[in-house]
Design a protein with these regions (language model features):
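A short, conserved alpha-helix in the catalytic core of glycosyltransferases
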Residues: 131, 137-142, 147-173
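Conserved donor nucleotide-binding strand/loop of the catalytic core
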Residues: 19-38, 42-46
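Short beta-strand-to-loop acidic/aromatic patch adjacent to the donor-nucleotide binding site
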Residues: 52-61
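Conserved donor NDP-sugar-binding/catalytic core segment of glycosyltransferases
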Residues: 67-100
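A conserved acidic beta->alpha catalytic loop
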Residues: 8-17, 32, 62
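A recurrent flexible, glycine/aromatic-enriched loop bordering the glycosyltransferase active site
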Residues: 113-133
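Short loop->beta transition adjacent to catalytic acidic/histidine clusters or analogous donor-positioning motifs
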Residues: 1-6, 25-26
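Short alpha-helix within the catalytic core of nucleotide-sugar-dependent glycosyltransferases
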Residues: 16, 41, 66-77, 155
Length: 177
């Protein structure tokens, strides 16, 4: 069973009304802008409280490819659930690698991905563009830090987990950002 939880972070452009017209979405409307860090914190806490087994975190402008979740679940099965998180390969709309969302093998070294790379590669840091993790990891390592507001929350959070857990980029799972 899969649900879509949306955190509407004080939008003022008609988003709340549009979301209200979508019967298959579960929405929470926050009355003040708490930044993307706060939104991710809120949404992940919500997913943990509802007791979902898995959480797939995405930025509001992420476009996962139709098989992206299937590829993440397949990698989870291959790894036997033994991972801190899984991340999708991030592409631009033209299909090239999105440099701002490259996963890292250390705080100072990006993973050199190409558009044609496949497989499951070790990573230490990833963005919230498409991050897949089990509820137990959120319970064990906590939530993103709200004080970052908009920058670096994802790098800190994924590194916090990868210090103790093996984490990966799943190259066959792609998302456009």
């Amino acid at each position: 069973v899969c649900d879509i939880l949306i955190v509407d972070n004080a939008s003022t452009d008609g988003t709340a009304q549009w979301l209200a017209s979508q019967p298959d979405l579960f929405c929470c409307h926050i009355d003040r802008n708490i930044g993307s860090s706060g939104g991710f914190n809120y949404g992940m806490r919500w997913a943990v409280e509802v007791e979902y087994d898995y959480v797939w975190v995405m930025d509001d402008d992420t476009l996962p490819q139709p098989d992206a979740l299937e590829k993440l679940l397949e990698a989870d099965r291959i790894l036997g659930g033994h991972h801190g998180w899984l991340s999708s390969k991030c592409l631009w709309t033209d299909g090239s690698i999105c440099p701002m969302n490259r996963q890292r093998v250390s705080p100072y070294k990006e993973i050199s991905l190409t558009e044609s790379d496949s497989g499951i590669l070790p990573a230490q840091m990833a963005s919230f563009v498409s991050l897949f993790l089990r509820r137990e990891m959120i319970l064990k390592y906590g939530l993103p830090i709200c004080d970052f507001f908009i920058w670096t929350d994802d790098w800190e959070y994924t590194r916090r987990i990868s210090r103790s857990e093996r984490c990966y980029v799943v190259c066959s799972s792609t998302a456009v950002h």
